Amino acid sequence: LETQPIDINSEYEDGHFYVTLNKGVKDLKLFYQINQDETVLYDSTFIISESANIKTWAIKNDVSYGDSLEIELYEHKGLDARIANLKVYSKTYDGGGDDAIVNGLRGGLNFRDGHWQGYFGTDFEATITLDSIQRIDSVISSFYQYNLSWIFMPKQILVYTSVDGDNYYKRAKLSPSISVKQEGQFFEEFVLTFPEV
């Protein structure tokens, strides 16, 4: 894979996202905007306390270098969740590791940005354990499609819940209606709602 000029990393701790930008190439100046606000020259980790859009870009010798990178950070109940029973994902598209499915960071339109987790020849499956028993009434997930690169939406999304970790009950089922023939690069957010449990 080609080197990306910018890599975005985010850690969530004590109610805050700690965001770090890394240069993929030497001698770059990195800039960012939060929620399309003022442009800031990046010099160190910055802190965000709520859901936000982050746009970053690189400059080298006063000229734009590579494509800009745009991601979304989402605050949600599962940010500190433990992940188990995660099926093996592609090493090429690991999304940042096991916690990529709950880290609150959604990738952009470039599937090579390092923030999408991909599966080949196997279904995605994982058990997400929250740090305490909590009431939930929905699960939101985002999926990416770019048919020219053989990246497709799931055929079906199922959500099960459990209070004790042993007995699971199906709460929601969704079958996305997006055709595999639909052209272009895009992602869709799916909201699966169910009676509060």
Whereabouts are the PLM-identified features?
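Short proline/glycine-enriched turn/loop motifs at strand-loop junctions of beta-rich domains
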Residues: 23-28, 133-136, 154, 197
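Catalytic cores of secreted or luminal carbohydrate-active enzymes
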Residues: 1-3
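Solvent-exposed segments in extracellular or luminal domains encompassing
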Residues: 44-53
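Disordered, acidic Ser/Thr/Pro-rich linker "stalks" and the adjacent N-terminal cap
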Residues: 5, 68-133, 144-151, 180-184
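Short, exposed coil/turn segments at beta-strand boundaries within extracellular/luminal domains
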Residues: 61-68
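Trp- and acidic/polar-enriched beta-sheet ligand-binding modules for extracellular glycan
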Residues: 120-123, 148-197
